[in-house]
Amino acid sequence: MPKTEFQDLDYQFSIEIVKNIPIELKNEFKTVLSVIDKELINYYYELKKDPKINYLICIEGNHIGYSSIYEDDTYWNLYEIYIKEEFRELGLGTRLFQFIKNNCQNEGKQIRSYTLPSDRRAKNFYESNMITARVLIMEDKRAKSRYKI
């Protein structure tokens, strides 16, 4: 199984494939997402398939982030990528993403990701990693939308 280790910021990091993501990380991800738009989050979870590949990133053995992927004939569909708040803006999400992307390309596949339109941070992350939007779902504006017209 692919695994990588690297030294950065005077810490030892590792990224590896695991069978299951630790529940505390999954719950933290759901909590962070829930502030965006509960209706969209529910829709997202209806679309999401069970992951086939889970990546876990650790700092000196402590879980700090993960990614879940569903593989089909053409794509590795990246449904979730999450780094704990205190470890963001350090390039760790990019390291995790690049490791996944390299493994994906080694399998002869393309990478595809799903994110919510109101998640500006995710949009910026993907664009900085050379991933661009291809599809938008448009609907009537909701009363509790984060955006003003």
Where are the regions that the model predicts?
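Short amphipathic alpha-helix that is part of the acyltransferase structural core
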Residues: 1-42
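Active-site rim helix/loop that mediates acceptor-substrate recognition in acyltransferases
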Residues: 33-56, 68
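Conserved acetyl-CoA binding element of GNAT-fold acetyltransferases
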Residues: 74-85, 114, 139
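Conserved acetyl-CoA-binding loop-helix of GNAT-fold acetyltransferases
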Residues: 83, 89-102, 124-128
